[in-house]
Amino acid sequence: MISIVMNTNDWKYYYKRTADAVACSSNMLYTALMNPTKDILCKHYCINEDYQGHQPSMTQEIIDFFFEREVKFLEELQHLDCTPKLLEIDRPNNKVFIEWNTETLAQIIFDPSRSIDDEFPNWKDQLYNVVKEFKDNGYYKLALYPHCFFINKSGDLKIIDYYSVVPHDDYFIERKLIAGMIGDQGSYRFDQSETDGVIDLKNFFNLTMNIH
């Protein structure tokens, strides 16, 4: 890991592409910033209405909670083939810097002029290997959307958003800790995994894999 704090003053927002071809913020927990050469991504865990829009339920407490999870599991799982190289952690400013390569899979999949099969022929095998690698090492990876993956410069599939990593032996969490970041799209998975205010994230993962 490098030892200086990166200056992001001239970095640009990174926006994901959605299924209806709209560019929007890539995450509700952090501001995604891409350097001019598009090979480093800064994940700035903060409340930024300019990037994310108004989020009345989001609090700094929730942001900090997920920042700590991001750092913990990125560091803990650097040995996995699918984990992007961690370049720097700027704790005072809640920033994480990782290797990057221009765009996520969402940019390819949701662009009718592009084909993931043509650009990345073995994507299915690599995706299977990502899920298997987490399983074999004793973890669930809950966020598996197209915008959570990118292809690095070596042609390897990498996955981001390590705040959504859950150990096999520690998969319960109180809903009140994360309620402010539960969106409408996948809220049923939280609802169906909750008992007495506690969410079973193992069940959440199974719903993600089998239904969502």
Regions found by a protein language model. Name each.
Residues 40, 82, 96, 158-161:
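Protein kinase-like catalytic core scaffold
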Residues 152-212:
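C-lobe/activation-segment region of protein kinase-like
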Residues 126-135:
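Short C-lobe core helix of eukaryotic-like protein kinase catalytic domains
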Residues 63-66, 73-123:
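Conserved structural core of kinase catalytic domains
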Residues 1-21:
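Juxta-kinase regulatory segment immediately upstream of eukaryotic protein kinase catalytic domains
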Residues 135-152:
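Catalytic-loop of the protein kinase fold
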Residues 14-75:
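ATP-binding glycine-rich loop module of kinase domains
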